[in-house]
């Protein structure tokens, strides 16, 4: 189903590991996983891929899972913004998605102001989607931010 994928391993345990993944129908031409951990007990990464979409061109896709504490998230947002400013050409199409653990809705204002990103569910429905816990979502922790193109439909996946 997904001929292209990138996986950035962020933490390794005796019983397995965890990280971020990007799945694509289109060729992933490059990828890099950056350590954005805010402290040693909570390993976090920023997975950055460049995807080549036939007839459209290249798009930068970033996947994150931010810290549980607000101070850590703030530092991680700073790292994400620095990465985008350094590597992604100004105004170039971009998707930034993942678990932002953004209980207070602070990331969106910062990402809009500094990178020109909009959140797809906020644009469509007026607020981010409920996505956690998966079985009965009540919290709005996951986000999809974009720039450089229009999103016509977005939904929370409820399958397994």
Question: Where do the model's predicted regions map?
Answer:
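Metal-dependent phosphoester-hydrolase catalytic domains
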Residues: 50, 82-95, 100-160
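Charged helix-capping and loop-helix junction motifs
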Residues: 76-81
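Short, glycine/acidic-enriched loop or turn micro-motifs at the edges of active sites
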Residues: 66-68, 102
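Structural recognition of the beta-strand scaffold that forms the well-ordered cores
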Residues: 60-63, 95-96
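Acidic/histidine-rich helix-loop elements
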Residues: 38-41, 67, 133
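Short aromatic-enriched loop/helix-cap "lid" or pocket-rim segments at secondary-structure transitions
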Residues: 17-20, 44, 74-75, 106-110
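Structured beta-strand-rich core segments of catalytic domains in phosphoester-bond hydrolases
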Residues: 1-60, 150, 156-159
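A short secondary-structure junction signal
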Residues: 33-34, 62-63, 72-75, 108-109
């Amino acid at each position: 189903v997904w001929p292209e994928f990138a996986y950035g391993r962020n933490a390794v345990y005796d019983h397995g590991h965890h990280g971020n993944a990007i799945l694509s129908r289109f060729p992933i031409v490059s990828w890099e996983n950056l350590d954005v951990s805010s402290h040693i007990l909570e390993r976090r990464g920023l997975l950055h891929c460049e995807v080549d979409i036939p007839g459209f061109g290249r798009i930068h896709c970033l996947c994150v899972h931010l810290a549980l504490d607000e101070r850590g998230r703030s530092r991680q947002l700073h790292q994400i913004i620095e990465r985008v400013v350094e590597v992604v050409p100004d105004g170039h199409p971009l998707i930034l998605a993942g678990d932002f653990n953004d209980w207070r809705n602070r990331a969106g204002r910062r990402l809009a102001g500094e990178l020109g990103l909009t959140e797809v569910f906020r644009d469509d429905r007026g607020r981010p989607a409920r996505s956690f816990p998966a079985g009965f979502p009540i919290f709005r922790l996951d986000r999809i931010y974009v720039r450089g193109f229009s999103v016509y439909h977005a939904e929370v996946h409820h399958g397994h």
